[in-house]
């Protein structure tokens, strides 16, 4: 994804390209890596490859929070990527897909539940937030690929809206721990734990800032103005998958 010549060759002759960004395993623990800058550079490569190859239809996997120019932590690279792709000529039609938080991110809580008997984060409470299944993301992208392309379009993708406390109850019931709680601790405590685990301090701060943004109103402001029809995979459905992973 970092080689413009290679990506141009891949894109040549394509009717539609679907682009997303990722870094290698262990990137968050690379002490010399600026994650936001590295992924932003991938966006520049995509832009060059799209221009050189002559592709006119693009689907880009972005994220909730991409409308924010600051205050979103590591999600800032999604804002940067959308801006970069929006620099393409107007005859290039782009669909920006903005999913919300992935259910699959919840797998990271399994070791914590096993050792501490609770989900611990720096956000939580009874306010409902949107979550999404990768299956619903795939379904929406497949749908958008089949639809006409014209100009620039943003579409949010979500499967369910639940509060952190509701989530703890649903997941707890699924794993046989009906008293499972979602506990909230200070950002500073989360940050210290991430750094102690070996994470790049800048990256850790970016992760914590995502949590901080979830406690405010700005992260979901544009989502709430443009709410999508919710997908088919509810948290109760994902809880079955979570329970299987928990039992391994």
Residue positions per predicted region:
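Residue-level signal for the nucleotide or nucleotide-sugar donor/cofactor binding architecture
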Residues: 2, 132, 162, 230-233
């Amino acid at each position: 994804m970092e080689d413009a010549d290679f990506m141009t060759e891949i894109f040549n002759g394509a009717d539609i390209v679907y682009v997303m960004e990722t870094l290698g395993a262990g990137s968050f623990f690379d002490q010399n890596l600026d994650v936001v800058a590295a992924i932003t550079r991938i966006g520049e490569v995509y832009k060059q490859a799209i221009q050189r190859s002559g592709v006119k239809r693009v689907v880009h996997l972005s994220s909730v929070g991409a409308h924010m120019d600051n205050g979103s932590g590591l999600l800032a690279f999604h804002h940067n990527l959308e801006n970069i792709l929006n620099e393409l000529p107007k005859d290039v039609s782009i669909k920006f897909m903005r999913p919300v938080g992935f259910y699959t991110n919840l797998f990271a809580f399994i070791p914590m539940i096993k050792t501490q008997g609770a989900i611990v984060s720096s956000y939580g409470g009874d306010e409902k937030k949107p979550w999404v299944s990768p299956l619903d993301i795939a379904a929406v992208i497949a749908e958008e690929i089949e639809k006409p392309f014209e100009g620039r379009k943003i579409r949010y993708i979500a499967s369910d809206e639940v509060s952190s406390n509701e989530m703890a109850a649903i997941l707890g019931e699924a794993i046989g721990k009906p008293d499972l709680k979602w506990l909230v601790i200070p950002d500073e405590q989360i940050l210290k734990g991430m750094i102690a685990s070996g994470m790049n301090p800048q990256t850790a701060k970016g992760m914590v800032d995502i949590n901080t943004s979830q406690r405010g109103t700005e992260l979901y402001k544009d989502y709430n103005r443009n709410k999508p029809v919710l997908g088919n995979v509810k948290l109760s459905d994902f809880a079955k998958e979570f329970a299987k992973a928990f039992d391994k």
